Amino acid sequence: MITGYDGGGGAAAVVVGASGALGSAIASRLAGAGLVVVGVARKPVDAAGVIGCAADIGDDAAVDVIRAAVDDVGLPVRMVVQAAGLPAAGPLPTIDPTALGSAVSLKVGGMLRLVRAVADRLGPGSRLVALGGHYGTEPSPHTCAAGVTNAALANLVRQLADHHGPDGVTAHLVAPGPADTDRLRRLSQARADERGVDVEEILAERRAESPLSVLVTPEQVAWAVATLLDPEADALTGSTLALDVGARRGI
């Protein structure tokens, strides 16, 4: 069911998408903070100190798989993080509507599945964290699925905050801008191929969206998520923490 657990520790975290760039950075950071981390992914998890749990968060069967893994650890859950990445579903003019629905099921439905899997182990001070993204509030026809899904995720986080607040459990959306990951480079390469330009030109355009002319790093995202463990983060429940290096233009 799970791999790599030796029976130690005092509280657990569950990170979905732990084989990806953002999820693995978050899982490693939380493990470094002293939590016993269960890393959920379809692929093998290769993050130091992280327990692997094979499950597809887009499938309802993941609820029982994750619940069993957490029960094997036998600790209260201090934090869950839904960091599953979306497949490249295409721009607005050509996206398959079915693919859009699948994206919502993966990220938004996946957050519900994750919370239900650990519900019996939540308590005062537990954090429910979802990774959204810049395009949830800055719509772009090039990123249809990401925009629609991350906007819906922000709404779900507010609902989770309202529902779980009386139990002392908080909910948070962390919304990075375009992050410097292999996935971003693959998407940028696809756009470069469409336009007949070099991929570095596309990456430069993405960096130029920020007044700092940089991309967010996985380490910065992991830092922000770990900061939510602080008791002062109660004040942030239901809100969105934007990590877009100034790219968002809305007020």
Question: Could you say what each language-model-derived stretch is?
Answer:
Residues D198, S210-V221:
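A conserved structural motif in NAD(P)-dependent oxidoreductases
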